[in-house]
Amino acid sequence: MKNVVIVDCLRTPMGRSKGGAFRHTRAEDLSAHLMKGILARNPQVNPSEIEDIYWGCVQQTLEQGFNVARNAALLAGLPIEIGAVTVNRLCGSSMQALHDGARAIMTGDAEICLIGGVEHMGHVPMNHGVDFHPGMSKHVAKAAGMMGLTAEMLGKLHGISREQQDEFAARSHARAHAATMEGRFKNEILPTEGHAADGTLFTLDHDEVIRPETTVEGLSQLRPVFDPANGTVTAGTSSALSDGASAMLIMSEEKANELGVTIRARIKGMAIAGCDPSIMGYGPVPATQKALKRAGLSIEDMDVIELNEAFAAQSLPCAKDLGLLDVMDEKVNLNGGAIALGHPLGCSGARISTTLINLMEAKDAKYGLATMCIGLGQGIATVFERP
């Protein structure tokens, strides 16, 4: 089996879904811009040597339908000989794209792959056209299809208080804002054209979803949004709605050495796990345990961790059961997370992996973990190693 390495990773800024900079920019354009951008940063790589493009996207309809990966590749002017497939594992789609591309390289079916994902939640909302089979109610609770209610359930089971959630959300915004002000996102963001409030074109070079004014006190005034009578999860402690795309250029270690490109990280372990759909947010725990076992490592070996923040009520139980609560400030979501940056579904897996790799470089870390929950009860995890 061949070693798989990441030679570059990049993302668009996260645009606000409601009236944000990308309100007139299509998902295919965000993707095509990123595909061109990551290849422009790596002139040693001949695009014609790319075997396949794996691109995550959840709502594969409207502008994101009919294989958005291929549409974007054609818009980007990439060689028509390159294949392209759109991958859907709900929230874990672009991390699944990474796993799919990595396995193709490991088995020798490819030398170079381009992976990533996109979601324009402003143009194609998460619940657009959703039609669950009526018979599902015989197998899972109806609320299992309502992500906010699964977060409520998970939080209650683990005794997560409203105050803990508000503190976690405020931390996310504060850290993301600090990372922006200190230029820590600069290397991972590809400036992208958008529209200002007055409709004029401009280049967005930062995430516009972050709310630096967020405080625990302000969050405490918000009403529960999913269970108004008895709940604790609010809009402020849920991942923001945003539009964005992410990309990673991966290849075999032998190919990277042949081309003389810098190896930024190596894939050390990968895993998927299922869990009860009613507490879908718990998926990162079993997925991480499997990935670490396959990598021959422990959670203590991880120097930096990106745990996708679907909800504060979901992230905190995962952090607790993974033994991370005491090392949050040293290791976990050091540049904030999806509560501040948003969670464009098909984009997020490669986005958190991109942020992780940049953090690993900044901290001269050896090992890193990226993991996330997935709707209807799954988790996905990837362990990375710096050379």
UniProtKB/Swiss-Prot annotation:
The active site is at C91, H343, C373. Keywords: Acyltransferase, Cytoplasm, Fatty acid metabolism, Lipid degradation, Lipid metabolism, Transferase. Signal peptide: none annotated. InterPro entries: FadA, Thiolase, Thiolase-like, Thiolase-like_sf_Thiolase, Thiolase_acyl_enz_int_AS, Thiolase_AS, Thiolase_C, Thiolase_CS. It catalyses: an acyl-CoA + acetyl-CoA = a 3-oxoacyl-CoA + CoA. GO terms for biological process: fatty acid beta-oxidation; phenylacetate catabolic process. It is an enzyme of class 2 (transferase). Gene3D superfamilies: 3.40.47.10. It is found in: Cytoplasm. GO terms for molecular function: acetyl-CoA C-acyltransferase activity. Its EC number is 2.3.1.16. One of its GO terms (cellular component) is cytoplasm. Pathway: Lipid metabolism; fatty acid beta-oxidation. Disulfide bonds: none annotated. PANTHER family: 3-KETOACYL-COA THIOLASE FADA, 3-KETOACYL-COA THIOLASE, PEROXISOMAL. Heterotetramer of two alpha chains (FadB) and two beta chains (FadA). Belongs to the thiolase-like superfamily. Thiolase family. Catalyzes the final step of fatty acid oxidation in which acetyl-CoA is released and the CoA ester of a fatty acid two carbons shorter is formed. This is 3-ketoacyl-CoA thiolase. The gene is fadA.
